Amino acid sequence: MADADVHRHARAAYDNLGRTAIESAVLAVRGPAAIRDYMPIEGRAHLDAALAGGTGVLIISGHMANWELAGATIAAHGYPADGVVRHMGNPIFERWLTRVRAASGMR
């Protein structure tokens, strides 16, 4: 890979990290109300129809962008949201992120 491409990819990764950090900090302070209007659920009728069957819904997402915000958005719109996550290497960050998840309505 050319040096310019490496630099471009590294810059994009840090740009995404910064955006994710800001979104998580806002969520930690303001809670679900901060994202209800900011993050609407497209295709909500499909989600409601699937949940009407009474068996629950499994939403699978790739490991891209702010996946924490995706779960928080579901919870902010009144749906129960559970996440499957791995433990972080930093226990201080893990405790903080666990509190952010709980404050957003995720379990």
Q: Where are each of the predicted segments found?
A:
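Membrane-proximal helical "anchor" segments flanking the first transmembrane region
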Residues: 1-58, 65-66
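Catalytic core of membrane glycerolipid acyltransferases/transacylases, capturing the structured
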Residues: 12, 53-107
